[in-house]
Amino acid sequence: MSRVGKSPIALQGAEVALSDERITVKGPLGSISQNANRLVKVVNDNGTLKFEPADESREANAMSGTMRALVANMVHGVTKGFERKLTLVGVGYRAQAQGDKLNLSLGFSHPVVHQMPEGVKAETPSQTEIVIKGIDKQKVGQVAAEVRGYRPPEPYKGKGVRYANEVVILKETKKK
């Protein structure tokens, strides 16, 4: 059995609704649901969730660990939430959150407007910092990657949009 799949999930402040095809987790920040895999049996046992492969195949064994990780992320998302911090490095690079849109000035001849998907919010504590928050880990990471993709850090001066903990290794310029 998968090592990840063996460990149970503690449902601290979250409620889980299990059906044959969906797993729905509700918490103080909202609710999120996921398709259940037919190869994995999910058991709710007094505030803990346990995942077991439905048969002895390698695929069922692997999917038990995958489902456990996905549901653990759902529980974490509805109780504490996920956030990703981005930093803008460069002269004139600015960000401003307006409702469900993120306005970016990244040195192009036009401003870049990024539409936030449902369930994801952007905050700008300062003009060069962006905090992306939400309950779905995949959506938060995807939005952060899309925003970073508008102007990734370039290797000579390091200008661009980068994750807050990202280390950009700078190249040396050519010498004559």
From Swiss-Prot:
PROSITE patterns: RIBOSOMAL_L6_1. One of its GO terms (biological process) is cytoplasmic translation. The keyword rRNA-binding applies. The keyword Isomerase does not apply. GO terms for molecular function: rRNA binding; structural constituent of ribosome. One of its GO terms (cellular component) is cytosolic large ribosomal subunit. Keywords: Ribonucleoprotein, Ribosomal protein, RNA-binding, rRNA-binding. Pfam families: Ribosomal_L6. InterPro entries: Ribosomal_uL6-like, Ribosomal_uL6-like_a/b-dom_sf, Ribosomal_uL6_a/b-dom, Ribosomal_uL6_bac-type, Ribosomal_uL6_CS. Disulfide bonds: none annotated. Belongs to the universal ribosomal protein uL6 family. Part of the 50S ribosomal subunit. This protein binds to the 23S rRNA, and is important in its secondary structure. It is located near the subunit interface in the base of the L7/L12 stalk, and near the tRNA binding site of the peptidyltransferase center. This is Large ribosomal subunit protein uL6. It comes from Paraburkholderia phymatum (strain DSM 17167 / CIP 108236 / LMG 21445 / STM815) (Burkholderia phymatum).
